[in-house]
Amino acid sequence: MSQQLTYSSKINKIRTFALILVFAGIITMYGGILTKNIEWLMVIFFILGTLMVILSCAVYVWIGTLSLRAVPVICPSCEKPTKMLGRVDACMHCKQPLTMDKNLEGIEFDEKYNSRKYKKK
């Protein structure tokens, strides 16, 4: 039984991280409401929750600027427009590995191809 590897695009990974931060911040602040009898603990929960939500906003702004600089391409598998960050990425829709580097065509997909160490080789 062969294992099918599933890749996801970098933009979607970062957006998912920011969304998790929003929900984690809200849940943390809800924990502050549950501990309202212990005032100092409630304040800590609210501050941590607020910082998480603010950090998620910063991540969303950052990924928005990255998304504007990403190269738009048409996926050869699903023929939908997607964006690529780096030398290798995955389609946002069908998870198909993509590359714009002719040297990497036909080679097994690996995210290490985006690292600076690999580019120097």
UniProtKB/Swiss-Prot annotation:
Keyword Ion transport tagged: no
Topological type in the membrane: Multi-pass membrane protein
Ranges annotated as spanning the membrane: 14-34, 43-63
Superkingdom of source: Bacteria
Keyword vocabulary terms for this entry: Cell membrane, Membrane, Transmembrane, Transmembrane helix
Cellular component terms (Gene Ontology): plasma membrane
Localization annotation: Cell membrane
NCBIfam families: PRK02935.1
Similarity annotation: Belongs to the UPF0295 family.
Name of this chain's protein: UPF0295 protein OB0906
Organism the protein comes from: Oceanobacillus iheyensis (strain DSM 14371 / CIP 107618 / JCM 11309 / KCTC 3954 / HTE831)
